[in-house]
Structure formats: structure tokens, C-alpha cells
Amino acid sequence: MAGGAFVSEGGGGGNSYEGGVTVFVIMTCIVAAMGGLLFGYDLGISGGVTSMEEFLSKFFPEVDKQMHEARRETAYCKFDNQLLQLFTSSLYLAALASSFVASAVTRKYGRKISMFVGGVAFLIGSLFNAFATNVAMLIVGRLLLGVGVGFANQSTPVYLSEMAPAKIRGALNIGFQMAITIGILIANLINYGTSQMAKNGWRVSLGLAAVPAVIMVIGSFVLPDTPNSMLERGKYEQAREMLQKIRGADNVDEEFQDLCDACEAAKKVDNPWKNIFQQAKYRPALVFCSAIPFFQQITGINVIMFYAPVLFKTLGFADDASLISAVITGAVNVVSTLVSIYAVDRYGRRILFLEGGIQMIVSQIVVGTLIGMKFGTTGSGTLTPATADWILAFICLYVAGFAWSWGPLGWLVPSEICPLEIRPAGQAINVSVNMFFTFLIGQFFLTMLCHMKFGLFYFFGGMVAVMTVFIYFLLPETKGVPIEEMGRVWKQHPFWKRYMPDDAVIGGGEENYVKEV
């Protein structure tokens, strides 16, 4: 035994249901995954906009003034302004609050309705921002964008996990993260283009957020609902027909029976929130739905994603160079997510988590050291082109490690481990914890950089080390395991089995899903 680590047996185990991978289910999941464009576009656009001089002079003149007059005593503090950070981070407070409402809507009315509400809110918010004349309009727009993100991030990963066959669930679910990374890259490219405009480039950047919102709204009309959601609302025949359609087979009796068993168990739960917090058998789901989004944000990734242009500018990159560097990291993000799509259902979740964690630790330490050697604690100094290239290279290495590990798996794993009766509540916890810590990082990163200086990168590297150990000892492999049979995986884990009663296991057969290594 190596530290109690577990892996899947036979590709993850689980019942082998009838049917295969149909074009219909792949196209459905691709359309649904476009919900990630909302989140990704916002992550990418805000940092570029807040580095544009016209935007700063109109809404945040104090930041613009101190940047030009170099009033601050250190380069680390160039952009340290709470109101400026509130523009970026306010979205995530709204997303946090709306995720709880989205949980109830998703359970009662289906996953599609949540996607529709999210798209409409994001559309209205993008218009507020594009036509903003004061900071109040900007903040209101950001709050509406947050409602959109909260609804989309709550419903889309659940939708993808429920539609996809178990053997390719990871790859299809990561389509959501892929859409996020594409949204970030598109936003970075748009920011670079609009920064060349003589006037109102920031309005174009913020207003184009309406495009992914429209895609989301249209998608919510054309997508079918999931069999799980139909069963929750008593539509048994429609659920069977949909299952036959997405699996491409008439004989879906075994899988349909497991879904019905899970649905019957769900009906016995009057209050999913009370159960997930109080019943021991839901302890693994509660821990991972809370810990994984916390760890995902404490990697520091969103520092790179929505403050990349500001960060590169702080380090001495010229205006164009800072935006181009953000485009480069965005492109690395997209390509590396493709690696995850290829590997997640072949090699499993654990190996990606562990390798990506080690890669991020090394990268953060090197970046912190390079910045410390050039700027020290005073913040005085300049980057040579060679040092700037090395910093950019290791930031790209860090982004790559995140993009094939904590990025996609941070959404995939929580969405595939919760039984139906607590699934909306579990995903709401996942989204709300994610948004809360995204808010904290967004609101205080520039202040942390001002006070912790290059040591901030050591802080993030240390946190990645902690979470890598957490994954090694506590996360079993979930590759290829049907969602309705996750109870069997927890039952055979050396730590989590103490919380799992015999009736927590759904599904026939005596398959072993995990084994010690």
C-alpha cells in the first residue's frame, strides 16, 4: 500500500450498460458546455479592461493618476485599489448568492431552465457594462453577470455528467472547462484588439459578453432535458425515451432501473441541504464539494486569468506586451485543456491531479524566485528581456499544469460524486465555495501582492502542495464509475468506508471499483 491511495480496477469498474456513444449526445454536450463561455469570457475580459488607460481615467482616476505619477513606493503596489478590485470581484459575490437559488430551480424545474435564466441575466449585465456612465452602473452590471455565472455554473456541469455515458463522462464534462478556456482566450484577443482603438475600446470588450449569453439562451431552448431530471419530475416514459435516444439503444433497462432506484431514494429526502450536512453517508460528497473548489481557487489561477495584463504590467511589461502575454497564457490554457480531454478517461482523475499539482508547485516557486531576484522587497528594479521571457515561460508551465488538472477536474469531480437526492445541493455548495474564494482572491490579490510581494507566489505554491497531499490520500479514482454507483466506491475506500452504511450502495453486481496500490 502506498499511503492508502486507490485506483480504478478495469478502467473504473461499474456496470457496463447497453448502448454506445451517439452523435446526438456528443452534440448535446458540446452545446451545453458553451455555458462555460460566459465564465471564461468574463475571467479573461476584466483584467484587460482594468489595464486600459481610458477605462481607468473615466472610472478609477486615482489609479490612473498614481500609475502615471508613480506615487506608490513600490512597483508591487501600482494597482492596489479596493474599488478597482471590487469591479472585478463583485461578480463572484452575486454568483455565490445566486447559486443557492439556482439549486432549487435546477431541482424543481430542470437543468435547462437554470441555463436559460443564467443566459438572460448575463445578457442584461453585459449591456449594463457596455453602456455604463458611472461606477454604480458597472457594479450593477457585474452583479447581473454574477447571477448568470451562478446559474450556468450550477446547472451545466450537472447536465453534462447526467447526459454523458460513464466511459466518456470525463471528456464530455471537461467540455465545460474547455469552453471556459476558449472564452478566456477570445477575451484576451478582443482586449488586444480593442486596446488599439482610439476611443471606447473598453465598451466593445465588455459589450461583446452578450455573444456567449445569446448562445446560452438559444442553447437552453434546443437542448433536451436529462433523464435524471425528467425522473425527478415524474416523467418516467419521457425519461426512458430520452435515455434510449442518448444511448442509441432500445435495451436500457439496467441503466434505467438504476436511475429509477436513485430517483426513489431522492424522493425520500425532503430537505437535501439538511441531509448533506447531517447524514454521515453524504460526508465524502460534502467534503469534496467544499474542498475541491476551495483548493481550485487557492492555486492562484484566477490571479493569472483575470489579472494577467495587470500583473505583467506591474512586472514591467509594456502595454502591448502585457496583453500579448495574456493571449499567450490563454492559448496555453486552451491547448492544455485538450490534453485533459484526451487523458481523463484513459488514465483517470488522480494521476492528472497529482502530476498537475507537482508542476504548479515548481512553477510558482521559480516565478516567485525570479521576481524576488529582480525586484526584491523594495519593488525597485527592471526586468531584462531574458528574465521576462523566463517568467512568462514558467507562468505558462503553471497554467498548463492547472489546465489539465485542477481546472477541469475541479468542476468534473464534484458533479460526478453526488447521489441524485443531494446533487443540486452538492453542486450549489461547489459553485458557492468556488465563487466565494474567487471573490476573496479577486478582491485582495493586488493588496496581497503589495504587502507579500514575491512571497505571494510561494504562498500559492505552498497551498498547492497541501492540496496535492489531500488528493493523494483521500480521493478515490472515479473514472468509468456510473454516478448512481459512487456509494460502492466510498464503501471500499479505507477512510470513507466508516461513513457509508450498506444501503448507500445502489446498483447490482459485486464488482470491485477500487483496489489498494
Curated annotation (Swiss-Prot):
It is a multi-pass membrane protein. CDD domains: MFS_STP. NCBIfam families: SP. Residues 1-18, 475-517 are cytoplasmic. It comes from the Eukaryota. It is found in: Membrane. Disulfide bonds: none annotated. The lineage of its organism: Eukaryota, Viridiplantae, Streptophyta, Embryophyta, Tracheophyta. Keywords: Membrane, Sugar transport, Symport, Transmembrane, Transmembrane helix, Transport. Belongs to the major facilitator superfamily. Sugar transporter (TC 2.A.1.1) family. Its main location: membrane. The keyword Methyltransferase does not apply. One of its GO terms (molecular function) is monosaccharide transmembrane transporter activity. Optimum pH is 5.5. This is Sugar transport protein 9. SUPFAM superfamilies: MFS general substrate transporter. Inhibited by uncouplers such as 2,4-dinitrophenol and carbonyl cyanide-m-chlorophenyl-hydrazone. GO terms for cellular component: membrane. Mediates an active uptake of hexoses, probably by sugar/hydrogen symport. Mostly transports glucose, and barely galactose, xylose and mannose. Pollen specific (at protein level).
